[in-house]
Amino acid sequence: MLSKGTKVGAPQYTVEELTALVDEAHSRGLKVASHAHGTQGIINALHAGADTIEHASFIDEEGIRLATANNAALSMDIYVTEYILGEGASAGILEESLEKERMTGSTQRANFRKAVEAGATIVYGTDAGVYPHGQNARQFSRMVRFGMTPLQAIQSATVTAAEVMGWGYDVGKIEAGFAADFVAVKGNPLGNIELLEEPAAVIKGGVRYR
């Protein structure tokens, strides 16, 4: 999307190339995240055995079916389109990229809803680095707006993400024996998910940073 001279949706690797990459990574105990907006690129990555699909903007019913069957997770950053189209130009994002975003954002959100309704595994993802750190919690309310319950959105960033990354034994839960990583908010985020945008406390590894 932000790369110069690229066409939205055009796959850049064959299934054979992707399979070689995935097999090598898995043989070393590594997870594979596939950066894919386009329908065919998503399907290629899923056939190759990718563990997660980043963006998945133009995923279709076949892609959703494959992701579910393969237990692959979708990381669909549906807030970022608002930042890019609202503040991107002043932040130096090229018009070429702004035009790509105009072509993509609404479709990605519609497909996010379809993936949620189909029961696909969805993990919280924000395309970190595109917009200022600290705004990333805005993703939660968009996930709820486009089909998730507040609990599902919170789980996508905690227990579900931990399990997808293979870290479910150590993080993702508030439970004895797990890392003391959590935030506190003034109220119940199950009733108002936007509370997560203003945490009253941030604890990482048992140390309070805010």
Regions found by a protein language model. Name each.
Residues 27-31, 96, 104-188:
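His/Asp/Glu-enriched, well-ordered alpha-helical/loop segment
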